[in-house]
Structure formats: structure tokens, C-alpha cells
């Protein structure tokens, strides 16, 4: 089950494209592989509330319908409601499933809601969270400062990256699988992660 966060943070650009566009591309690639391997697939999209719910599909002919649904995911300026979205999604599932959550967080408050929502479902379902590396923040944190403003920016960037790592570590401690990938490698990383989890028979 692919759960795509379409909230405000996912509409921010990474290397010229909104995060959500990169997430949808990775989702479609992995969905194609899953259908090819004979698995059943569903697509959900949400922001402050659920927006799209495909139901479970199987077989390669279903891929075209997933593409149409993915194209209908709209950019949203609303904050993501993880609790509502993931609780609603979990209630629709009648068996243990792999949930692939594409999301983004920039503050500890929203991240805490995500972690709490994840904790509620990770005992029942296999949860894989996919985020894009913030390469711009990494560049700022690693750059040699030339001015006082550069120092301030570097310190701020380093603090944000520490917070980010803390959140991802909390998720992993809950038993959530995490992929943090470069924007141009997220599709291949997700396919590899999906195939690995399937090979390990964790479902």
C-alpha cells in the first residue's frame, strides 16, 4: 500500500521539482515492479484528510489505473494529519500489509505526530517510510563559512539535520524501516528496499 503525503511540506521543491512529484515517480516504479511480481497494490494520498483511496488492484493491466490516480494527486497547502490519514488507512486493511509512506517533515512537532501515528500501526503492518535527503541543508552545514552569516546558517542547518536524524532513529527503534535517499535515486532505492523486505519474508 503506497501512502503519499500531499501536504504542504511535500510541495516544496527539491532540485527544481516538488517532493511529491519525485515521490509519485518512485511510487509508480515500485508499483510496476510489485504488480510484475504478482503482488497486490493500493494507492492512498492525503494531506489534512484522506484524498485518494484506490482499493487493492493486481495484474499489469491495473498499472494504467494507478497512473491515472497518481496524476490526480493535487498539491496541497494544508498541513499533514498523520493520525487521521494512517488510522483511516489501517482501518481499510483486512490483513497485514506493507505500507510505504512517502512524507517530509521540517519541525519536531509534526514529526512527533508522525512517529506517534507510526507507533499505532507498526505492530500490525510492515511500515516503510521514505524521505528525500535534504541535500541543500547538508551543503550549508558542510560549507566552509566565510562570514558571520555563513556561520549562523551552518549552525542552524546542522541543528536541523540532527533533529531529522533523531526522528528517523526514533522510527527505526519502533521497528519502522526507513529509506532516506537522494532525489535522483529514490526510485531505485525504494525498489531495492521493497525487494529486500519481500525476500526476507517480513510480511
Spans of model-derived segments:
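Exposed, interaction-prone extracellular/peripheral surfaces
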Residues: 1-203
Amino acid at each position: 500500500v503506497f501512502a503519499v503525503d500531499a501536504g504542504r511540506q511535500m510541495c516544496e521543491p527539491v532540485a527544481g521539482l516538488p517532493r511529491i512529484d519525485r515521490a509519485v515517480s518512485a511510487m509508480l516504479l515500485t508499483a510496476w515492479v510489485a504488480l510484475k511480481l504478482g503482488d497486490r497494490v493500493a494507492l492512498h494520498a492525503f494531506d489534512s484528510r484522506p484524498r485518494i483511496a484506490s482499493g487493492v488492484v493486481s495484474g499489469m493491466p491495473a498499472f494504467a489505473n494507478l497512473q491515472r490516480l497518481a496524476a490526480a494527486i493535487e498539491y496541497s497547502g494544508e498541513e499533514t494529519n498523520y493520525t487521521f490519514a494512517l488510522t483511516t488507512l489501517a482501518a481499510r486493511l483486512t490483513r497485514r500489509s506493507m505500507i510505504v509512506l512517502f512524507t517530509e517533515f521540517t519541525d519536531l512537532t509534526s514529526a512527533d505526530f508522525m512517529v506517534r501515528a507510526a507507533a499505532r500501526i507498526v505492530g500490525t503492518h510492515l511500515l516503510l517510510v521514505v524521505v528525500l535527503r535534504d541535500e541543500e541543508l547538508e551543503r550549508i552545514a558542510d560549507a566552509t563559512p566565510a562570514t558571520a552569516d555563513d556561520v549562523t546558517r551552518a549552525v542552524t542547518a546542522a541543528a536541523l539535520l540532527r533533529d531529522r536524524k533523531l526522528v528517523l532513529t526514533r522510527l527505526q527503534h519502533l521497528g519502522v524501516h526507513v529509506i532516506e535517499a537522494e532525489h535522483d535515486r529514490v526510485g531505485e532505492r525504494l525498489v531495492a528496499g521493497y525487494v529486500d523486505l519481500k525476500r526476507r519474508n517480513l510480511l
